[in-house]
Amino acid sequence: MSSDANSDDPFSKPIVRKRFQATLAQQGIEDDQLPSVRSSDSPDVPDTPDVPVNQLSSPPLSLPETLSEGNAETLQNLSDDSEPEMLSQSSTSSLNRRMEDSAIDPSRGTRKSQSRGFDYDPAGERTTAPVQKKKKDEIDMGGAKFFPKQEKKHVYTHKWTTEEDDEDEKTISSSSNRYSSRPNQPAVSARPRQPVYATTSTYSKPLASGYGSRVRHIKEANELRESGEYDDFKQDLVYILSSLQSSDASMKVKCLSAISLAKKCVSPDFRQFIKSENMTKSIVKALMDSPEDDLFALAASTVLYLLTRDFNSIKIDFPSLRLVSQLLRIEKFEQRPEDKDKVVNMVWEVFNSYIEKQEVGGQKVSFDMRKESLTPSSLIIEALVFICSRSVNDDNLKSELLNLGILQFVVAKIETNVNLIADNADDTYSILILNRCFRILESSSVFHKKNQAFLISHRSNILISSLAKFLQVILDRVHQLAEEEVKKYISCLALMCRLLINISHDNELCCSKLGQIEGFLPNAITTFTYLAPKFGKENSYDINVMMTSLLTNLVERCNANRKVLIAQTVKMVIPGHDVEEVPALEAITRLFVYHESQAQIVDADLDRELAFDEGGCGDEEEEEEGGDESSDEDGVRKDGRLDRNKMDRMDQVDVVHALQQVMNKASAHMEGSVIASYHALLVGFVLQQNEDHLDEVRKHLPGKNFQNMISQLKRLYDFTKATMAKRVESNSGFRAIERVIEYLERLE
């Protein structure tokens, strides 16, 4: 190719390239290894004269990305194998001479040609300069283009709060540097914006990748539902209380608000919300003016009744008890008679929904109220039953019941209803009220000396006189009542016995007062010698134990009562025998013998049923000798033992049935043993200071001695000591049993 190109031609100016210093010493050898370009390799390029090979050569040149038509010759010249050498960046004369020696064909196209000199040769391990894009900040100085060194610009970054934010910023900056080489990066970050109400508990910080964020602490569906219910309960309660506490609201509005609150209290979750948030005081404070209106008082009593129905009922303080005492005295509706039926119907609907909701949940509800008997007093009495039973160990509550006049009202209520029953009035509702009143007094008098003394001496012993009258009414009327009514009377009688046991415990005054009431002691003995065996089969155990315990309290420290008891003649019936009248001491002794023998029979049956074969050699011999012995369908052999082979073939239902029978017999054995023990304890106390009647007792005992009584009392002592050892109040009971055992042992 011709080399007559003008040196002033602008396209003949050299393109400055950096020399790689690491390859200068090997440049001559590498030039010899470069293959030459033949005409056959580029058919469109004409032959060019040979160019002498220089000892030094520059590395391959990187071409601009865009070339105009004017520099096509330069492109072709740079693609040859004999590329001119660049001695330095500042020397341009040698490059100009090299460019003049090369002939550029103007007819040659501007397309980029391939050369083996620029191909990657893995064997040569050539270090090539990376292809770089043309920078915008190139500087043209005298025909040479310099790329100034790019210095990192210092950018001020404000540190806002904590070190954690600094670490997050470092993470984000490192991640952005890592992905800075990616093409087509968006100008706006892909991280979603957080709402202004976002908190650290629900929204987390962005991930290191920079793509979105991760939400932590996601609540479960049930947690979301509970949270929503909690908010609803809180808003509803605040709204209702605002109406109840408003001074401008009328009594009608407050009454309707209280009924709305009662409808909310039907839900167990709402009642639990009230207790967990300690809203009881706020509710009681909002209902403090309810006694001023009878219908408002009915709605308030409904709220208190529902709040006390749970096992973990609300805590009752002094303001609550004061409200209860005020509502307890409202027994009639004397205000707003035109709205009475409407309010009563609304309250009755609340109770119907409550009963329905409890039955759906599988819980049995005992609700014996009638619509026509709905009053604030009746509802508060029902609520007091639960309040006192849950606070049986709270002495402060028991004292406040007395100070606020609640016990006085309950005693008066008992007197009124006993008189109604004695006058042959409608006694169904009266029996229900007596049942509730007995429960309240029982809980409020247990191990509380002050309340016991008050109940005994209040209004000239009106309580114990009313109880003795009620006992006489039961014995006179039980023959005329239907079976269902008899059950109600016997159940109420058992509760009355519990109350009398509490107030007569270690109280000589009560014992003497009860012994002085005409007919009380013989009637008390008749309850377990005649009434319980004949009419109260379901409550026979309770009547026997409760009434025997009451008589034990009466004769333990009062010899006058012992003499009165010995002188009495009572009716007695033993199962399988006719009714007969015998002396009281003989009746108690014969009942002891009966129950003790029943316990021994059950004990022997249990020994036979629980004696399983162990599969020893002796058993095999017995089986060979008695091989003809067959077992019945229940798996019991003729000798009374359970057949193990038969038991192994029984399915699970049959095994459960067999075990249930064993447990029933064990329960019957325990009941018989306990009743016999209490009869023996009563006989032992009656015989003290009355040794003249020892022969009357011995002639009815097995072996004519007291050994069976002593053994039963020792069992009772061990059982009581094991179950009541931690209670200080039971120490007197231990000592009483010990004294009777020692007394009977001396008699032997």
From Swiss-Prot:
WAPL domain residues: 205-723
Low complexity bias: start-end ranges: 35-64, 172-182
InterPro entries reported for this sequence: ARM-like, ARM-type_fold, WAPL, WAPL_C, WAPL_dom
Residues covered by region (Disordered): 23-199, 614-644
Localization annotation: Nucleus
Biological processes annotated in GO: DNA repair; meiotic cell cycle; mitotic sister chromatid segregation; positive regulation of double-strand break repair via homologous recombination
Signal peptide residues on this chain, from the entry's feature table: none
The name this protein goes by in its record: Wings apart-like protein homolog 1
One family name in Pfam for this protein: WAPL
Sequence ranges of Basic and acidic residues compositional bias: 634-644
MF (Gene Ontology): ATP-dependent protein-DNA unloader activity; cohesin unloader activity
Comp. bias intervals (Acidic residues): 616-633
